[in-house]
């Protein structure tokens, strides 16, 4: 068995069955069943769902949506990712799988916005997300670091 890695989940009935494992252990606000069912019905081939398989079973998942700030009052301008419903099965929690999912999203090099759910503020703090408060509610934001050592064509001689 290879080292677990993050992969884009297929929108199909096998994934739907895998999602049912999460229903009993998480809060209703983390449920993705209805969201996945809607994508199956719409025959949407671009899956917003990502997960980690271990031993052939889905053990951790999240959804990522590409968004564009249309004037919302928060610290992101332009294109960003919205990370929703990150969840790891209880047996596999505190083993780095949630962090692995977040690091995958960070690797896409877009700012990330997420809402801390179910006592997860410490998790987001540990991963260098910054808390943001706006009238609509609180959330966390992460910005990619800019590489100060990068030389552009205009700067090179």
Curated annotation (Swiss-Prot):
It comes from the Bacteria. One of its GO terms (molecular function) is acyltransferase activity, transferring groups other than amino-acyl groups. Pfam families: Acetyltransf_1 (PF00583). This is Uncharacterized N-acetyltransferase BCE_3967. Its EC number is 2.3.1.-. Keywords: Acyltransferase, Transferase. Residues 9-146 form the N-acetyltransferase domain. InterPro entries: Acyl_CoA_acyltransferase, GNAT_dom, YlbP. It is an enzyme of class 2 (transferase). Coiled coil: none annotated.
